[in-house]
Amino acid sequence: MLELKFVRAHPEIVRADLTKRGDTEKLAWVDEVLEMDRRARELTVAIGDLRNRRNVISREISQARKAGNDITELLAEAAGLPERIKEVETERETLTEAVRYRLMRLPNILHESVPVGKDDSENVEIRRWGEPEIPAFDLENHGALAVEHGWADFERAAKIAGSGFYFLKGRLALLDMALQRFAMDILVEHGYTPIIPPYMMNRAAYEGVTDLADFENVMYRIDGEDEYLIATSEHPMAAMYCDEIFEEKDLPLRLAGLSPCFRREIGAHGLDTKGLFRVHQFHKVEQFIYATPEQSWDLHEELMANAEEVFQRLGLPYRIVSICTGDIGTVAAKKYDLEVWMPREERYREAVSCSNCTAYQAVRLNIKVRNPTEFTEKRYVHTLNSTAIATSRAIRAILENNQNEDGSVTIPKALRPYLYGSETL
């Protein structure tokens, strides 16, 4: 959410950003916000004047009564003031809500380095790591391979939960757990505090994290309750300190969340229709940082470096792309994706998303940091997030990149201590 005072002071920046995004439908909102805000402030003055008149007229009635003067008109005016005040307050509240509605849906201001593009086809590659390989033998579909080895059961999961769910069994269940602990151990080495968050959030908290109008259709809502299953641990970690004030000495605050993630809509994408890449439920280790504005851009690079370390130590080839204006969404000011090599498709696929949301979430959630020299001065923190590992996608990458001609799968060396020293699944 953009601060109202920012829109007042810099409407030209907001307009230029919307134009850069190609979101011209919202250009009219900027003028609407300014006009409704101006009118709401006028009404605030009017309410103050009416309340003052209510106090004054009480004295005038008392004085007129003592002087024996006619007080009929004064009494009539006094009787009408409460209703008039209520009417003006209602009008102001309507305007204030209309302003907030637009501010909640205006996108974040993009960093100047974000590339311009219409969709994900125009994201810009930044760098690559590792050598993508296409084996001489025909790779087996990761889902079919897992079923053949008794590592996964999709049919029985569909029978009890529907499509898009799965049982992980035996060695693959252990691999999922190993990936979680492996990524968490790396983050702990770098000073991140492990967090296991609530797996549900109420609507008020979720609206502070993201625009539910855009996001609600991919989430599971608890029937009859004002609760949602979380789509990522980023969301409860972002809302964790809502309506609180940090001391600057306590920032940056680095968190590492571990949770299942629940997504309703998964789509159908060719080779992904059966398997582990797009599913309704998966485990993820998520990085999250609260920071001062001065710290946040360096920390954005730190988050990306941490995710790269995870994939480098797993030996999985990847590339980093900078997300363009047409693909970045509402919340992030800048976003990178790490795309891991999938040899069966002979292309890179998204495995990590790394965002600097600047103050956008903090304004919605009212999370501030106090100026250490001016105790009463406060400003909004910046929030940043990045996947460390989403286990289902990493498992697919391992089953494809490390698949051998005999159908066995070589375990990355970094994971072997978590899998009893085994070299293959």
UniProtKB/Swiss-Prot annotation:
Top-level taxon of origin: Archaea
Binding-site residues for L-serine, renumbered to this chain: 232-234, 286, 387
Keywords attached to this entry: Aminoacyl-tRNA synthetase, ATP-binding, Cytoplasm, Ligase, Nucleotide-binding, Protein biosynthesis
Signal peptide: none
Keyword Cytoplasm: yes
Entry keyword annotation includes ATP-binding: yes
Subcellular location(s) of the protein: Cytoplasm
Main localisation: cytoplasm
Chain positions recorded as ATP binding sites: 263-265, 279, 350-353
UniProt GO BP: selenocysteine biosynthetic process; seryl-tRNA aminoacylation
Catalytic activity: tRNA(Ser) + L-serine + ATP = L-seryl-tRNA(Ser) + AMP + diphosphate + H(+); tRNA(Sec) + L-serine + ATP = L-seryl-tRNA(Sec) + AMP + diphosphate + H(+)
Gene3D superfamilies in the record: Bira Bifunctional Protein, Domain 2, Serine-tRNA synthetase, tRNA binding domain
Entry GO CC: cytoplasm
Biological pathway: Aminoacyl-tRNA biosynthesis; selenocysteinyl-tRNA(Sec) biosynthesis; L-seryl-tRNA(Sec) from L-serine and tRNA(Sec): step 1/1
Record-listed E.C. numbers: 6.1.1.11
Gene Ontology MF term list: ATP binding; serine-tRNA ligase activity
Binding partners and assembly: Homodimer. The tRNA molecule binds across the dimer.
Similarity section: Belongs to the class-II aminoacyl-tRNA synthetase family. Type-1 seryl-tRNA synthetase subfamily.
Protein purpose: Catalyzes the attachment of serine to tRNA(Ser). Is also able to aminoacylate tRNA(Sec) with serine, to form the misacylated tRNA L-seryl-tRNA(Sec), which will be further converted into selenocysteinyl-tRNA(Sec).
PANTHER family reported in the protein's UniProt record: SERYL-TRNA SYNTHETASE
HAMAP family: Ser_tRNA_synth_type1
Record text about domains: Consists of two distinct domains, a catalytic core and a N-terminal extension that is involved in tRNA binding.
Name of the protein described by the UniProt record: Serine--tRNA ligase
Organism encoding this protein: Methanoculleus marisnigri (strain ATCC 35101 / DSM 1498 / JR1)
